[in-house]
Amino acid sequence: MRPSGRKLDQMRSVSIEPNVMKHAEGSCLIRMGETHVLCSASIEDKPPPFLKNTGLGWVTAEYGMLPRATTSRNRREAAAGKQSGRTQEIQRLIGRALRAGVDRSALGERQIVIDCDVLQADGGTRCASITGGWVALRLAVNKLLKAGIIVSDPIVDHVAAVSCGIYAGQPVLDLDYAEDSTAGTDGNFVLTGRSRMIEVQMSAEGASFSRDEMGQLLDLAEAGIAELVAAQKAALG
């Protein structure tokens, strides 16, 4: 029995509210159960220096958590003077994941920055950030297309992410914190809307896992991604 009472293959409730910020070119608030992440997309009219005169654009991401996103207060990283290794790892993952769904030549020499701010954390914040970040990116690109700034759509497919793991000896979909903190195996799966894999991160936290178990987790992830892509489409109308 999962702590939440969910079935092994049951996602948490998912909602994506678009256009929640006035100034950002694209934004949304994604809720996956009790994990809530505010995602925004900002368009910058020049690429990073290493892409100057290449004709290619760039998508990057920044990630952070509010001090009371968790059960006890975490000190702001700005106050500490540096980002944690975890934060740097997560924002690089978000950027890599979203770039995989973009034709950077069609984007032109500009950069889109995705900001993911965790308002409340209950497991799966990086996955929620990728799924919501894609919606913010899609909305920002729509504005470029509508304004005639770019002529071809650079977004080639949906991108979404979900966690899966082995909890109490059973493969489960979409781990919350109670499960994630005690799972024997933990994994994050980033897929396209056509179930093509972008990134798979799996690790044995308490016990090693078999190839068959990995396949079971991938099957769960594909089903979960299909639900998340449906939520993305519903948010965009």
UniProtKB/Swiss-Prot annotation:
Signal peptide: none annotated. Homohexameric ring arranged as a trimer of dimers. It comes from Cereibacter sphaeroides (strain ATCC 17029 / ATH 2.4.9) (Rhodobacter sphaeroides). HAMAP family: RNase_PH. The lineage of its organism: Bacteria, Pseudomonadati, Pseudomonadota, Alphaproteobacteria, Rhodobacterales. The keyword tRNA processing applies. This is Ribonuclease PH. InterPro entries: ExoRNase_PH_dom1, ExoRNase_PH_dom2, ExoRNase_PH_dom2_sf, PNPase/RNase_PH_dom_sf, Ribosomal_Su5_D2-typ_SF, RNase_PH, RNase_PH_bac-type, RNase_PH_CS. Keywords: Nucleotidyltransferase, RNA-binding, rRNA processing, Transferase, tRNA processing, tRNA-binding.
